[in-house]
């Protein structure tokens, strides 16, 4: 996976304490946007109620049979073989160390983890959580991808999967992060 390195918006560094405070305040919105992007029909007030009450948990086992990613135009991109994912993830972590900018590291992780499908399920959710953790640890806001921008997000994802080019997705993510950092 590659992307064009060009001038992108400056993301304001808030400091870790302020970033965590904002995360706490924005959590219902972050959760609702993530769920809505995947077709969940909960309303924002319902998400707030569930988070406040702690009414969520995951149980059980998960098994998969391979699979792939369905594109907006109906195309299909098969997953990479499972036995190659561990090495690919290790290679990704090494390559991220070569990036000086923690924002670029976090967003590149999101793009690569989403493209490689490292996780059995919830790849975009998991990649967004890891990217947000990296951002917060360096004093930036968490990554929020607004549901209102779903079409733009899906088009950038299609480009990522079809051409193995993360340029459009990196630009989109930088824009989302700049928006959520204000």
Q: Where do the model's predicted regions map?
A:
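FIC/Doc superfamily catalytic core
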Residues: 1-182
């Amino acid at each position: 996976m590659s992307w064009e390195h060009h001038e992108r918006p400056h993301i304001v560094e808030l400091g870790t304490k302020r970033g965590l405070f904002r995360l706490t305040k924005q959590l219902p919105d972050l959760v609702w946007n993530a769920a809505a992007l995947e077709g969940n029909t909960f309303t924002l007030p319902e998400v707030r109620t569930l988070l406040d009450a702690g009414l969520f948990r995951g149980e059980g086992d998960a098994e998969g049979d391979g699979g792939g990613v369905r594109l907006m135009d109906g195309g299909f991109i098969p997953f990479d073989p499972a036995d190659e994912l561990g090495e690919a993830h290790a290679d990704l972590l090494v390559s991220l160390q070569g990036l000086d900018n923690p924002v670029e590291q976090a967003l590149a992780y999101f793009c690569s983890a989403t493209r490689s499908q490292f996780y059995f399920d919830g790849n975009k959710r998991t990649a967004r959580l890891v990217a947000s953790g990296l951002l917060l640890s360096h004093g930036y806001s968490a990554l929020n991808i607004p549901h209102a921008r779903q079409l733009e997000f899906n088009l950038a994802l299609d480009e990522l999967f079809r051409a193995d080019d993360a340029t459009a997705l990196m630009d989109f993510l930088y824009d989302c992060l700049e928006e959520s950092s204000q």
